[in-house]
């Protein structure tokens, strides 16, 4: 739930060297999501059943894993698989051998020169940090999200300027790289992003909802806030696992959430955009 607000993009002058189309000004709409902390949520019977089934499957996976002799090896494999799949959703595709070479180069202090592999390794490091930091009963905080993002972008071209920092300018999805005039989605303006993140973390630390439902809502809210210059999708999917850990749904394993989403990318992205709803709160669509 949320509302849309009109904004004006001033555009750039002829001295910018941009084409007329890219330097144009326009009116555009930003989406401002409602705060989540303290909100009440209701689910229809079908959704409630799906949530229950998903939680049962995750708990079964956790129980089966705990009976194995080497749970740490499986946990590392699942975390790595989840990180690679989450990266794939963003178009970052790296084969196993290529990733191993980049990992070995990083371990020896060398610059492997493989930009894509470095981004995937950054995602593995970010996920590892997030799930080592957030344990059952521990809070999810803005500093944890920022450090997760810093580790994600570490070793990339954007790391120094943007890693671990809330964006200070307007961003958008789709359209031109120079203005939001034809954007598919424009998240909230930068001056309210930090407050929205504080509220989101407060929601993540509630215990009134089933963990799977809470994680799904938190993920959608994070993506609608789009708090970073880059890496929002990967940190947002890591947040799903943070909620699972914090609520005690998982302790050792990382369920293959991104692996499933990666096989239904268009449906997943359409579903996320559908959560940016600004209609009547009592309607069926809401």
Task: For the regions a language model picked out, list residue spans one by one.
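FIC/Doc superfamily catalytic core
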Residues: 1-286
């Amino acid at each position: 739930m949320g509302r849309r607000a009109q904004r004006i993009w001033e555009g750039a002058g002829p001295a910018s060297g941009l084409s007329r189309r890219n330097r144009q000004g326009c009116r555009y709409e930003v989406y401002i999501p409602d705060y989540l902390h303290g909100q009440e949520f209701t689910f229809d019977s079908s959704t409630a059943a799906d949530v229950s089934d998903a939680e049962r499957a995750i708990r079964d996976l956790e129980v089966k894993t705990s009976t194995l002799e080497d749970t740490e090896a499986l946990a590392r494999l699942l975390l790595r698989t989840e990180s690679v799949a989450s990266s794939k959703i963003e178009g970052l595709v790296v084969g196993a051998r290529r990733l191993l070479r980049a990992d070995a180069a990083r371990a020896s202090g060398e610059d492997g020169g493989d930009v894509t592999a470095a981004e995937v390794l950054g995602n593995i490091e970010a996920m590892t940090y997030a799930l080592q930091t957030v344990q059952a009963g521990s809070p999810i905080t803005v500093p944890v999200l920022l450090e997760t993002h810093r580790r994600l972008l570490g070793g990339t071209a954007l790391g120094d300027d943007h890693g671990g920092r809330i964006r200070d300018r307007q961003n958008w999805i789709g359209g031109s790289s120079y203005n939001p005039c034809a954007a598919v989605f424009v998240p909230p303006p930068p001056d309210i992003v930090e407050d929205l993140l504080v509220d989101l973390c407060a929601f993540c630390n509630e215990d009134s909802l089933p963990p799977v439902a809470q994680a799904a809502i938190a993920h959608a809210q994070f993506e609608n806030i789009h708090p970073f210059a880059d890496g929002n999708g990967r940190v947002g999917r890591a947040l799903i696992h943070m909620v699972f850990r914090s609520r005690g749904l998982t302790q050792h394993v990382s369920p293959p959430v991104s692996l499933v989403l990666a096989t239904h990318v268009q449906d997943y992205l359409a579903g996320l955009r559908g959560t940016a709803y600004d209609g009547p709160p009592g309607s069926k669509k809401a």
